Amino acid sequence: LAFRDGLGSASGFESFQMREFEILLGLDNDDRIGGMDPLSSFRRMAEGDERSAAMLARLEDALSQPSLYESMMNWVERTPIMGSSYGSEGDAENVRAYIEAHLEAHRAVCEEAAERSTGWGAGDPSKMVARMAAAHDGAVSFLMPEGEISRARAGLLFIESYRELPLLTWPRTLIDAIVELEESMVKWRHSHARMVERIMGRRIGTGGTSGVDYLDATSQYRIFKDLWGIRTILVKPEKRPALKNAEFYGY
């Protein structure tokens, strides 16, 4: 507590490295609690302070550059799907056929799951059917936001579904490494909140936040939402659409 008094008004909001890390990864301001501006504290500190002004300039430069998330999604958007290359003739039709085939497989899996749970006596059958139908609707909305296929998400789905193909093993390894990176960040946020709660309880934060409640809320942040979300709609290998142009993905 004596150490906390020494901090004065200083807070995590003034952590240049954390803000830069979040920006470089691609945390959207709209996803921050209350849509907060991550640079507001630095703008105040930059007034009359040369070092803080330099930090602010560096953060503003980072904001002007493509984030890791944006670069990642631009990259997976160009994934060859069923041997069809991004922008090639007939690519849109080939991607649509793949997505429709996957969604049909997903629908069948959801229906089978609802039937099995009914046989096990797992609660109200009608509620389970509705729950699985909602899960399928979620898959449709994820792959076809506003009715249009997202080729980036289609690319992610293809990589995750056929990860054993030689050409897709290293892209899948990279995707999983980024998920692991964010998982580590989430674990750190949770551990930080528990440390604060253990030492100081639920006092108001030095930056004026609700303290531990605010820290717990930040552990819900997800930057690479699509990389996490795609795992919700995968189907077993035997249920996948039949692979076309398999030789394209070989050694």
Question: Which stretches of residues belong to each language-model region?
Answer:
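Extended amphipathic alpha-helical segments with heptad-repeat/coiled-coil character used for oligomerization
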Residues: A2-T79, G83-S84
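C-terminal accessory extensions/subdomains outside the catalytic/core fold
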Residues: R58, A62-Y251
